[in-house]
Amino acid sequence: MKTIVFILLCFLTVSASKAQVNDLIGTWTVFEMTQISGQTSEKMTEDQFKANGAFEDYFFMEESKFKQTGNLSGEGAVSTQEGTWKIMENKVIMTLQLGEKKMDVDYTYELKENKLFLTRTSPDGNIKIIMVCRKK
């Protein structure tokens, strides 16, 4: 009986993981971004994105392939990075190829009401960025 319960739990875990992966596959565009630093909070709305010509798109592809393209780096120019992605618990981890180096960028993620919420905190814990994306 314990063996059957264990196998059933393993199957449910694998099924849930596949569902999470399938839900993320596609192109997501950032339409709202909030930066929190201490007691200060700055929000960039969809209208502000449009007015500034700003955009950031995330491409979660099959076989763990990933691409991001946009102009939010602060320089205004459009840049593209490619790599891979994976889900670990409530985090999505993008491994980006930056020249000769690889860099892991991890976000806590939540899918809610057809929106993807990506949250990242700076290593020192002082700045938190929350991006809200919708599927294209």
What are these regions (language model features)?
Residues 1-24:
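Bacterial Sec-dependent N-terminal signal peptides
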Residues 17-82, 86-136:
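Lipid interaction determinants
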